[in-house]
């Protein structure tokens, strides 16, 4: 499993979660070629959680014949997959979308966390931080997930 994101801090974070390696798109001149190089010809599957539509097109180009593109993120602008149909057909790509998993998948995910196999990064912050959290999200500075605490401690 390789992670692709921007910045050294994100790379360290992904490796701490168990990624084999990391590619920083901000410092890699040809991201698609780099991924093909480290995966010996292309990835079997790419899961895109990015909000940038360009990430979806690049991901499709990183796949091997018969590869799977899993779209999880929803682009904030022009939400279209602008990959040539000929590429999808010739490479026999599988394209899936998933916003929320099934109950079974959610229970499996909770079990992985419970057994310590998956260690999510969760930061609890006060509800009053919400405007700043949005700014941090826009700048790509959030690692993991933020949980907003609404109730005051008594």
Spans of model-derived segments:
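Adenosine-nucleotide cofactor-binding segment
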Residues: 1-58
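Short, glycine/polar-rich helix-capping loops at beta-to-alpha or helix-loop-helix junctions
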Residues: 5-13, 78-85, 106
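Residues in the short beta-alpha loop(s) of Rossmann-like NAD(P)-binding domains
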Residues: 7, 75, 101
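Short amphipathic alpha-helical segments
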Residues: 15-16, 57-61, 82-84, 108-110
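Short glycine-rich anion-binding loops that position phosphate/pyrophosphate groups of nucleotides
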Residues: 52-53, 74-77, 153-154
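C-terminal hydrophobic helical "lid"/dimerization subdomain
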Residues: 57, 103-154
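Helix-to-beta-strand junctions that scaffold the AdoMet/dcAdoMet cofactor pocket
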Residues: 63-65
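Rossmann-fold dehydrogenase core element
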Residues: 67-70, 82-122
């Amino acid at each position: 499993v390789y992670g692709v994101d921007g910045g050294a801090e994100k790379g360290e974070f992904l490796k701490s979660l168990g990624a084999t390696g990391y590619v920083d798109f901000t410092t890699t001149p040809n991201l698609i070629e780099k991924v093909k190089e480290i995966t010996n010809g292309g990835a079997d599957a790419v899961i895109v959680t990015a909000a940038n539509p360009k990430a979806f097109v690049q991901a499709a180009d990183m796949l091997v014949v018969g590869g799977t593109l899993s779209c999880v993120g929803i682009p904030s602008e022009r939400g279209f997959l602008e990959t040539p149909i000929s590429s999808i057909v010739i490479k026999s790509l599988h394209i899936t979308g998933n916003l929320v998993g099934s109950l079974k998948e959610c229970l499996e995910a909770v079990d992985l966390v419970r057994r310590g196999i998956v260690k999510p990064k969760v930061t609890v912050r006060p509800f009053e931080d919400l405007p700043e959290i949005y700014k941090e999200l826009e700048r790509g500075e959030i690692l993991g997930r933020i949980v907003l605490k609404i109730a005051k401690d008594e």
